[in-house]
UniProtKB/Swiss-Prot annotation:
Belongs to the globin family. SUPFAM superfamilies: Globin-like (SSF46458). This is Hemoglobin subunit beta. Residues 2-146 form the Globin domain. GO terms for molecular function: haptoglobin binding; heme binding; hemoglobin alpha binding; metal ion binding; organic acid binding; oxygen binding; oxygen carrier activity; peroxidase activity. It comes from Elephas maximus.
Amino acid sequence: VNLTAAEKTQVTNLWGKVNVKELGGEALSRLLVVYPWTRRFFEHFGDLSTADAVLHNAKVLAHGEKVLTSFGEGLKHLDNLKGTFADLSELHCDKLHVDPENFRLLGNVLVIVLARHFGKEFTPDVQAAYEKVVAGVANALAHKYH
């Protein structure tokens, strides 16, 4: 990801305030509610039949935390996202057969969740930096597909 020093600082400063458990669960839940076709990758998580079921599904919330924990790890390696996410890219491509477009969708949802939680602190400049990061992470996760 091609970020300026100021953008890297904005991203890492905001990320230091993120409650990974709360926002991870919210981001993955929103993905599954807004884009219901993504639920097919999580059928083994139990009842995902309604928005309420998704929003209160313990496995969805736990996996959302896991996803954002990995995302946070990627923020420590912004200059090597492909290397950082190589194993996850392989897993999602070869074993789980996840449509790589879903990575982009989840990134978009994450930006919305961050904006909702941080309000005025999530300035247009911070949003622009996060848009670059989520695009870079989505690209890194889709790398094995190419």
